[in-house]
């Protein structure tokens, strides 16, 4: 080998080794966080950096999911836009978007697999969930989060409802309950869904004892988002009358109410089946209404919304359920 070739080969070897060391440093940076310690999966930290801080939405157009029922709790569809009145901070608003179509929904299923859901609770909940899926729109999009001591994404964005049920077939109940963390992750995930209409279905006994996020943080997030939460409280035996059972019911009620949804507490497997079917029907018999506030300002304040509906002549009073307001977050536009 000539001297020139020898020098060239040495240079190439040095460059190769330097590249390996550089790649090694890059790999180490990806595997370890800034403190030099092994990084945790996103859902094991405070549900990942992408969840820190509020969810910011474009508040130029305020969109509402509105449920209308009669005195017997039956869903009322087919109302015209002129039947609705929107008030923001007591001021009438002009409706710029209106639809009562049976449109598909992005649905996040949040399923409690903690120790308190053991025995018949989880079995009955799995069976009742199949009623929800059978009654839902064929184009609905699902994802599944199971939670005990931490929240874990088991299934990400599928139109196959049976895949959701299959994932739950062999799940075992154990450990504590990170309910707030699961809901927080659920809001973040469902807001990236394919469909403009978004909902969470929370299936739990409502008892949180292991979350990093607090109840107030989750409540604020739900008020900021356009996600409707439905809760099904799985209370067995003497749970309903116990202090923990009462606390769980109060938590689910409040989380559902601030989002414009509703919480249910079935007393039997038959009633549970009916409730899951009822939630699916509600999602298919809602109105989507949008408006641009007449005096919109990114002031970060809470703006109260009231939706009124005037029944057609000769019909009795109708009842409306929707979000009660929004935060106009600076920088949202």
Feature map (PLM): residue ranges:
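Scaffold/interface architecture of coatomer-like assemblies
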Residues: 29-333
């Amino acid at each position: 080998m000539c001297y020139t070739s020898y020098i060239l080969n040495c240079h190439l070897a040095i460059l190769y080794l330097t590249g390996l060391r550089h790649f090694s440093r890059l790999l180490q940076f990806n595997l370890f966080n800034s403190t030099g310690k092994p990084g945790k999966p996103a859902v094991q930290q405070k549900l990942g950096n992408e969840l820190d801080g509020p969810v910011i939405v474009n508040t130029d157009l305020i969109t509402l999911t509105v449920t209308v029922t009669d005195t017997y709790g039956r869903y009322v569809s087919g109302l015209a836009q002129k039947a609705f009145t929107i008030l923001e901070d007591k001021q009438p608003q002009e409706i710029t978007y209106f639809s009562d179509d049976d449109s598909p929904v992005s649905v996040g299923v949040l399923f409690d697999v903690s120790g308190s859901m053991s025995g018949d609770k989880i079995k009955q909940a799995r069976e009742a969930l199949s009623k929800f899926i059978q009654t839902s729109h064929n184009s609905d999009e699902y994802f599944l989060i199971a939670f005990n001591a931490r929240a874990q994404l088991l299934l990400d964005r599928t139109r196959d409802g049976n895949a959701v049920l299959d994932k739950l077939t062999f799940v075992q109940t154990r450990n504590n309950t990170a309910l707030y963390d699961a809901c927080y992750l659920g809001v973040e995930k469902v807001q990236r869904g394919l469909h403009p209409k978004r909902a969470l279905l929370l299936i739990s006994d409502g008892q949180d004892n292991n979350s990093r996020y607090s109840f107030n943080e989750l409540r604020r997030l739900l008020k900021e988002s356009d996600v409707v939460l439905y809760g099904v409280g799985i209370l067995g035996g003497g749970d309903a009358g116990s202090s923990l059972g009462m606390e769980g019911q109060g938590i689910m009620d409040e989380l559902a109410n601030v989002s414009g949804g509703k919480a249910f507490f079935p007393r039997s497997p038959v009633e549970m089946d009916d409730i899951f079917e009822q939630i699916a029907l509600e999602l298919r018999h809602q109105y989507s209404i949008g408006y641009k506030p007449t005096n919109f300002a990114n002031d970060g304040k809470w703006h109260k919304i009231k939706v009124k509906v005037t029944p057609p002549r000769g019909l009795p009073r109708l009842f409306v359920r929707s979000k009660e307001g929004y935060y106009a977050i600076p920088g949202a536009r």
